[in-house]
Amino acid sequence: MENTGLHDVNFSLRYDGLDAEKHEIELSSLGESLKGFSKILATAGTFALTQKYSRRPSTQEVKIYATEARANCFSLDTIMNFISQSQLFSGSAGAILGALVPYIFAKNSQKKEEMKYLKEALEKAIEALGNKDKDTISGLISVIDKMASELRPSVRQAVSPIGTTCNKISVTPGNGFKPAVIDEQDKAVIDQLDDDEVLGLREYRILPY
């Protein structure tokens, strides 16, 4: 299995519309958004690396860095770095991460078809790591669902510029997955959910693994 440094894994954040059309964005909105993305990406990166859900930054295995902004509407890339430089990131773990971040946004914006496709991709990536037992795979998917729900406050932060300084945000994994695109309609769905509620979706019980 191919291994790469986690710093080779990146996500591109693109803000479109309104102020972003002029290649600028309101600073406090950007700061709030990046705070949300930092939490989401660090939590997802740690899970992809360890298959563990670590809530506290002090227990997470990756740090998120931003590179120079680009005048592509308003875009910047994020780069993940290991806490421990001796660790390696497998291709299958990269596949988990590439599906996991879009899944977090799909679940919180109630996009059921995207959730179905991304959940299948997550199951295949988890299996490729050597987890052949169905109960183990189901248990890890349950943890992912719990993670996505508990990250809802960070998702709100990440999409907070929509409607004020941009019209939509695209989150593009660097490994072939389709970008997660969040627009004003999606933001309205995210904002209407309570922090412990996902409307119209089945909640998955966490199984021992």
From Swiss-Prot:
Keywords: Early protein. This is Protein 40A. It comes from Enterobacteria phage phi80. The gene is 40.
